[in-house]
């Protein structure tokens, strides 16, 4: 094993990419004419290129990672950042899929889902998550609605993590008209994440500024009951739910520029107790979106930064780190490293993995 390096080599990102913040990004990037914008060339490859080096996706800009463990592999869905270098907004039209059986070598499986998968959507293939239930795969995604103002959440279904995915509803699962956004904002219904509890009940969490959840019916494509607002300190966006040793963990984008913080609860519906920050602001990007999984008795933390040459606020790249817990079950803050998989357990780490 190579000696771990703890700390990124800072790579200069273009001054022409304005760091406008989330509101301006939504207003500038959330237009209906993405198809008319130029396609972004592949990023230049950093030298040297080694397996397992962060960012792990290098042939294109990627973002909003969502990992799924299935059949001995990690299936990693990512957004595709296509904004030109001079752009001041997100250009995102599709999701890409990668898989690995060792967390080092990643196979690209193409584009299983795009905005066009949802006939009622017009643009903005933002954050997503896929989950398996009873042999079928459900892909929950953020897109901009073509006829209802604002962003919406759709769900597509397939018999394989590779797709093909189809929209069985042919309508949105959640729309901006179903919730009351603060000050009339139209991007509060984004960033879906789904968790299936031990009793088989599935829950959909989502939100920007206001975190929300609702039960899902057994068919996984309909809500089952009211939408419930949560109170999480500093919540911005990007919720993700996982469970370990009977404790529920809800991590999320915290503040702006975003760190990743988390809360814990004894049940999936709370009450949630704020526990603190686990990932600091990332290089070159004010947004920060995580995915947490257990794979082969180890825990991993996926996120995005802007570390590829030419990267920036709207041209991000997916990275991964090992994740550790202490004896009390608290998450030990993440070390952002060049080779995240080489980071050794810090003092006080216990539980899963060597």
Language-model segment annotations:
Residues 1-13:
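N-terminal secretory signal peptides that target proteins for export/translocation
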Residues 14-23:
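Sec-dependent signal peptide recognition
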Residues 27-30:
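C-terminal motif of bacterial Sec signal peptides marking the signal peptidase cleavage site
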Residues 32-354:
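Carbohydrate-active catalytic/glycan-binding domains of CAZyme proteins
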